[in-house]
């Protein structure tokens, strides 16, 4: 069986606006999903993009890894301060307090990165080769959508932040050496973020104020378990279906 990677990236004046992707096994799904992704980009809360790029690649089934999705839970924060403190406390279960604080500080201050920050779990040093581009999780999909026709609300026109973030984070956390991920959506009308570690994806409410353009991701790498190149190659290039 041949799979197809369908990807969309949209930008406005060089700044990221929207992105979406999936893996599908049915060729007739490709044009439909491509059109839905483009329509999503054209109706984004961050504005109408001036550039939209779509990319479609065939992938042999033998190249695809299958990994389980993360377990899920939620944390109802009282306010942004409580949410940030909770995320930082969770990170201290897998890295030092210094690294945990650095990760949260970066998440709350970095602007307009196209991808994620890669942070060393021992030195708190940024490891991504290009600090503007960052690390871009790609080549992943939800196995449960392969056998059933995707729902427009789930994968196409309307963005399901929770589902898409869970699938992305499940792929990221399967990478060699990655011990944690934290994220805030850059959508101004979505204030929930998450922290993933120890096999669990925790939705954290009130990570930012409504209307805020704040958003980004930080991946934390245990550089004693895997090299930077190995982790990046898996996150960006290895095709993964989430079970």
UniProtKB/Swiss-Prot annotation:
Its EC number is 6.2.1.14. Its cofactor is Mg(2+). Pathway: Metabolic intermediate metabolism; pimeloyl-CoA biosynthesis; pimeloyl-CoA from pimelate: step 1/1. The lineage of its organism: Bacteria, Bacillati, Actinomycetota, Actinomycetes, Mycobacteriales. Pfam families: BioW. This is 6-carboxyhexanoate--CoA ligase. GO terms for biological process: biotin biosynthetic process. It catalyses: heptanedioate + ATP + CoA = 6-carboxyhexanoyl-CoA + AMP + diphosphate. Keywords: ATP-binding, Biotin biosynthesis, Ligase, Magnesium, Nucleotide-binding. Homodimer. Belongs to the BioW family. InterPro entries: BioW. It comes from the Bacteria. NCBIfam families: PRK01322.1 (NF002360). Catalyzes the transformation of pimelate into pimeloyl-CoA with concomitant hydrolysis of ATP to AMP. It is an enzyme of class 6 (ligase). GO terms for molecular function: 6-carboxyhexanoate-CoA ligase activity; ATP binding; magnesium ion binding.
